[in-house]
Amino acid sequence: MEVKLWNDKREREMYENFAELYAIIKATEKLEKAYIRDLISPSEYETECQKLIVHFKTLSASLKDMVPNIERFAETYKMDCSAAVYRLVTSGVPATVEHRAAASASTSSSASVVAECVQNFITSMDSLKLNMVAVDQVYPLLSDLSASLNKLSILPPDFEGKIKMKEWLLRLSKMGASDELTEQQARQLHFDLESSYNSFMAALPNAGN
C-alpha cells in the first residue's frame, strides 16, 4: 500500500520547498564552521556563501506566508544552526564581506578623527597668531583639540599632545574668563601646539611614506 506524504500538488511543492530550505540552512551551517576552522579558503567560502544566500533569499521570499519566521522553522525541526541563521537572516552577506565592511568603516572613522585633530591644531595655532589670547577664547579651542585627540585610539595615553593640552586646560581653568595670556604664555602655548602637532603627524600610520 502506497503511503502519500501529501494530498495534492500544492502540498507536495510546499514540502519540497521545506526540504530545500532545510538543506540550505544545513549547508550554510557546515560552511560557516568550515570557514571558522580554516578548512576552506576565504575566496572559496565567499563564493559558496554568496550562492547559498541568494538561494535562501529567493526561496524564503516564496515561502514567506508559510514560513514567516526562519528562526522558528529552525527550532521546529531542531536544526541547531545558529551560525547559519545569523548569516542568512541577520547578516545577509558572507563573513568576509562583513569583515571588509567593518575594517573600511573603522578606517573611515579614524580618518575623520585625524582630520578633526588637524583642524583643531591649526585653528588653535592660528587663533594665537591673531592675538586671540583671552581665556574664554583659548579654552574652548584647546578643549576641542583635547577631546579629538582622546577619540583617536592609535595615540597612547601618554602622547605628548594629550598631556600638554591637559596641563594647559588645568592652568586656564584657574584663571578668569576675561584674563589674557601674557606674551610669554602665548608664545609657550604656540610652541607646545606646534611641537604636539609635529609629534601627532609622526605618530600617524605611514607618516614616513
From Swiss-Prot:
Component of the ESCRT-I complex (endosomal sorting complex required for transport I), a regulator of vesicular trafficking process. Required for the sorting of endocytic ubiquitinated cargos into multivesicular bodies (MVBs). Mediates the association to the ESCRT-0 complex. It is found in: Endosome. Belongs to the VPS28 family. It comes from Arabidopsis thaliana. Keywords: Endosome, Protein transport, Transport. It comes from the Eukaryota. The gene is VPS28-1. Residues 109-205 form the VPS28 C-terminal domain. Pfam families: VPS28 (PF03997). One of its GO terms (cellular component) is Golgi apparatus. Component of the endosomal sorting required for transport complex I (ESCRT-I), composed of ELC, VPS28 and VPS37. Interacts with ELC. Residues 1-99 form the VPS28 N-terminal domain. This is Vacuolar protein sorting-associated protein 28 homolog 1. Its main location: other. One of its GO terms (biological process) is protein transport.
